[in-house]
Amino acid sequence: MSALEWYAHKSLGDGIFWIQERFYESGNRANIWLVRGSEQDVVIDTGLGLRSLPEYLYSSGLLQDREAKEDAARRPLLAVATHVHFDHSGGLYQFDRVAVHHAEAEALARGDNFETVTWLSDSEVVRTPSPGWRARQFRVQAVQPTLILQDGDVINLGDRQLTVMHMPGHSRGSICLHDKDRKILFSGDVVYDGSLIDWLPYSRISDYVGTCERLIELVDRGLVEKVLPGHFNTFGAERLFRLASNYISKAGICHKVSTFAMRSLASLALRVTNSRTSP
């Protein structure tokens, strides 16, 4: 199957494109975002990487400008992982320039498939990317990041800037990217319109509460109008406030006890199915 068949996209305007893997039918299917800039383009998360995402970006014309095709072809392209979980980081190995938060840089460099929580089944991939492919073959490949991110760093695209916000809780290196001028938040799995997951091996409820407090502050200060999440559909500031507030209100003793049990089971299952490093 070609890359052009595997992926699909739609434009949200203002140089932002929403890309998805068509034949990965799962709640884990991650949103891939392409953000065009005057001096640099950024891909936010890369999906599973079962087909070449860079090939799709070029073949579909997403990295070309009608007025200046040659300049666009030479424009730097940076792949940023909002975190290293498999559904977001699987395609990072296809890019020359890769950025990740420092808390998860070592796991990515090792190809640590326990920390990437690799969990994929044949039934979720409804059309195999190549003959004989099986989900048990899938691993997140080790990638040496070329850019280590910290809270407050700014990724300069020329005519727009993306500010890194370290937002742990879902994972220890989770980040959001904030386009302050346009009041857009690329949230990864920090927040999306669904049940927030805090029971994975490196999740931490206390961190998540602090992260949700930061999200509420963004809304209160009028700094976010639109959220482009790691899963499901986009939403606005009012929904962001409600999602963050609901998490904080539910993060009591009972939630912590049940989450501890779920984390223990998830960790056991992941250790059985994944080696610490990719082959």
Curated annotation (Swiss-Prot):
Its cofactor is Zn(2+). It is found in: Endoplasmic reticulum membrane; Cell membrane. Palmitoylated on Cys-254 by ZDHHC20. GO terms for cellular component: endoplasmic reticulum membrane; extracellular exosome; mitochondrion; plasma membrane. It catalyses: hexadecanoyl-CoA + H2O = hexadecanoate + CoA + H(+); dodecanoyl-CoA + H2O = dodecanoate + CoA + H(+); tetradecanoyl-CoA + H2O = tetradecanoate + CoA + H(+); octadecanoyl-CoA + H2O = octadecanoate + CoA + H(+). The modification N-acetylserine is found at S2. Changing Y93A: No effect on enzyme activity. It is a lipid-anchor. Zn(2+) 2 binds at D87, H88, D189, H231. Signal peptide: none annotated. GO terms for biological process: fatty acid metabolic process. Binds 2 Zn(2+) ions per subunit. Zn(2+) 1 binds at H83, H85, H170, D189. SUPFAM superfamilies: Metallo-hydrolase/oxidoreductase. Changing C254A: Loss of ZDHH20-catalyzed palmitoylation. Shows only a slight reduction in the Vmax and a small increase in the Km towards palmitoyl-CoA in comparison with wild-type. InterPro entries: Metallo-B-lactamas, NDM-1-like, RibonucZ/Hydroxyglut_hydro. Its EC number is 3.1.2.2, 3.5.2.6. One of its GO terms (molecular function) is metal ion binding. A lipid is attached at C254 (S-palmitoyl cysteine). Keywords: Acetylation, Cell membrane, Endoplasmic reticulum, Fatty acid metabolism, Hydrolase, Lipid metabolism, Lipoprotein, Membrane, Metal-binding, Palmitate, Zinc. Belongs to the metallo-beta-lactamase superfamily. Glyoxalase II family. Acyl-CoA thioesterases are a group of enzymes that catalyze the hydrolysis of acyl-CoAs to the free fatty acid and coenzyme A (CoASH), providing the potential to regulate intracellular levels of acyl-CoAs, free fatty acids and CoASH. Has an acyl-CoA thioesterase activity towards the long chain fatty acyl-CoA thioester palmitoyl-CoA (hexadecanoyl-CoA; C16:0-CoA). Displays a substrate preference for fatty acyl-CoAs with chain-lengths C12-C18. Possesses beta-lactamase activity, catalyzing the hydrolysis of penicillin G and nitrocefin. This is Acyl-coenzyme A thioesterase MBLAC2. It comes from Homo sapiens (Human). The lineage of its organism: Eukaryota, Metazoa, Chordata, Craniata, Vertebrata.
